[in-house]
Amino acid sequence: MLAGLVPAPDHGMREEILGDRSRLIRQRGEHALIGISAGNSYFSQKNTVMLLQWAGQRFERTDVVYVDTHIDEMLIADGRSAQEAERSVKRTLKDLRRRLRRSLESVGDHAERFRVRSLSELQETPEYRAVRERTDRAFEEDAEFATACEDMVRAVVMNRPGDGVGISAEHLRAGLNYVLAEAPLFADSPGVFSVPSSVLCYHIDTPITAFLSRRETGFRAAEGQAYVVVRPQELADAA
């Protein structure tokens, strides 16, 4: 634990650290990446507040990234018109930004440790682009990594908001665009955020985190990359 951070209550959250390397990196407390999925009902005001309070007392810096890319493509695949999809995405993102602002207010003096950006903003940075080149190449050249990404696509599509009207080729294309946009954050968040080490924090173990947290050959996570599943105690107990 770094200077300035003190042992803190768990804020009702339970951690599951994925792998021995992640455990060592997690102990440093240098940087956390919190990914927020727009439209995901898990990220209620209550859960988001608990998550940010938990991170604010455990990490020197925390980047919060909310995904605002390729959401409209999924809605269009569901049968919405382009105009309907655009309006729906705008409403969803407006509500999400409001919840994030309120959640940051709850962390008090720790708010200065946080930076909030959309994925589309992050995509404009040279650091993200450099890592994206590597993950795109790995998707084409490393069959096992590609399989993990495809498993993630199916998970995204099957758990999308809405009525679940079935899975089409359009859904899978939209899901792949969504997952490949996120892949740099899974594989090398230290590189994307220019930090020595980073802990990716999410409420479930995804196909990509499960794969990269164990991979020792071929395309691997960056040396300073760690993974933690963190969620409210009552949800962890029910899992």
UniProtKB/Swiss-Prot annotation:
<feature type="binding site">
    <location>
        <position position="202"/>
    </location>
    <ligand>
        <name>substrate</name>
    </ligand>
</feature>
<feature type="site" description="Could be involved in aa-tRNA binding">
    <location>
        <position position="178"/>
    </location>
</feature>
<feature type="site" description="Essential for the cyclodipeptide synthase specificity">
    <location>
        <position position="200"/>
    </location>
</feature>
<dbReference type="Pfam" id="PF16715">
    <property type="entry name" value="CDPS"/>
</dbReference>
<feature type="binding site">
    <location>
        <position position="40"/>
    </location>
    <ligand>
        <name>substrate</name>
    </ligand>
</feature>
<comment type="similarity">
    <text>Belongs to the CDPS family.</text>
</comment>
<keyword id="KW-0808">Transferase</keyword>
<feature type="site" description="Could be involved in aa-tRNA binding">
    <location>
        <position position="98"/>
    </location>
</feature>
<feature type="site" description="Could have a critical role in the catalytic mechanism">
    <location>
        <position position="182"/>
    </location>
</feature>
<dbReference type="GO" id="GO:0002780">
    <property type="term" value="P:antibacterial peptide biosynthetic process"/>
</dbReference>
<feature type="binding site">
    <location>
        <begin position="178"/>
        <end position="182"/>
    </location>
    <ligand>
        <name>substrate</name>
    </ligand>
</feature>
<feature type="site" description="Could have a critical role in the catalytic mechanism">
    <location>
        <position position="40"/>
    </location>
</feature>
<dbReference type="InterPro" id="IPR030903">
    <property type="entry name" value="CDPS"/>
</dbReference>
<dbReference type="GO" id="GO:0016755">
    <property type="term" value="F:aminoacyltransferase activity"/>
</dbReference>
<dbReference type="InterPro" id="IPR038622">
    <property type="entry name" value="CDPS_sf"/>
</dbReference>
<protein>
    <recommendedName>
        <fullName>Cyclo(L-leucyl-L-phenylalanyl) synthase</fullName>
        <ecNumber>2.3.2.20</ecNumber>
    </recommendedName>
</protein>
<comment type="function">
    <text>Involved in the biosynthesis of albonoursin (cyclo[(alpha,beta-dehydro-Phe)-(alpha,beta-dehydro-Leu)]), an antibacterial peptide. It uses activated amino acids in the form of aminoacyl-tRNAs (aa-tRNAs) as substrates to catalyze the ATP-independent formation of cyclodipeptides which are intermediates in diketopiperazine (DKP) biosynthetic pathways. Catalyzes the formation of cyclo(L-Phe-L-Leu) (cFL) as major products from L-L-phenylalanyl-tRNA(Phe) and L-leucyl-tRNA(Leu).</text>
</comment>
<feature type="active site" description="Nucleophile">
    <location>
        <position position="37"/>
    </location>
</feature>
<comment type="subunit">
    <text>Monomer.</text>
</comment>
